[in-house]
Amino acid sequence: IQSTNPTVLQHHLIHNTSPLEMPSVRQLWLIFVIGTLVSSVFMAPILVTSVNAVTLLLFFIVALPAWIIGFSTPVFAWWSTSNEYFGLSTTRKQGEWMLVAGMLSTLPALLINSLISPIIINLLGLSVTDEYSLGFGMILFLSAPIGEEISKALAVLCLARFIDSSKRGFQIGFSVGLGFALLENMTYILNSLLIGEGAAISFVFTAVLRAVGSIPGHATWTAISGYAIGKYVVNRRSNNLTEKSYTDTKSSSDSQWILFDNKSGLPIISSKTRKLPNLPSWLSAGQQKMVRITGNPVIAVAIAIIFHAIWNGSLWSISVLMKDSSIIVQLLTNMTMIFLLILILWIILRRLIPFALLTD
């Protein structure tokens, strides 16, 4: 820099505090619905007609976009739901950390489910190769819930610096669960596309059922753990730090800003403004029907494990009981159980959200 006058150059580094901005919930669900329907239409010729160059070309054209839409858009739709309705100011940096932490938590869970648990079960004399065997079932209703819920809870704990309330812990747990579901969903959607001639049907069923079932399930179970971890972190922080040091820490990590009206000069909104959650009826059953969430992290993680175990164990038990039945009976029974589990999940979620967000 050249100047005729003495010049002092100062470079200020500030944290990026831009808010998390996402497409609306309606837009994301619309993309998901249209994308899955169009993809299934393009894959239908393989199911209806014989495999030939034209049907294979149609399949390969739509396979990659179908996979991306199928595994990602429902996760981001639920993420947008939490960002839009939970009433918590979230920066883009915080949102990215939450999702990435959930994705990283799949690594220890995968290690437990794929390596450690099979070795232990084999040492007990049980087989894990037969899907109807007790050993295989133990992977589903014991190993997976324990390994996955503990891994996700530890991911929430790693984000303790973002936690300023139990409500924030609930939000972080919800987002971490979505990050975990994102990577898990990649595998399930890919498998549904590689099934062969029935890909058009398996893709739609897998994408839709996971969008309204497994994805919010992971988010809900981890949100329970996150709420308790949030309460624990806040209580421990207030007990261990003096009021001054806590204030200094908070002021150094939070940006202070005020937005003024350019005409009147009056303040419109500031960093201290707290938005009240505006919960729609489909997401909240109201404060009259809310269910309390424990503030003990150990109990909360145990509850998450139990819910997860019931989900996996119910589906596995039905498949074992119906293994000698016809394909039609097996399909109807499994679908009935899935719809029942989804209904129970939604009843629980709609009663947990008002407690976590409206009573903190």
Which residues make up each language-model segment?
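Hydrophobic alpha-helical segments at protein termini of multi-pass membrane proteins
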Residues: I1-D360
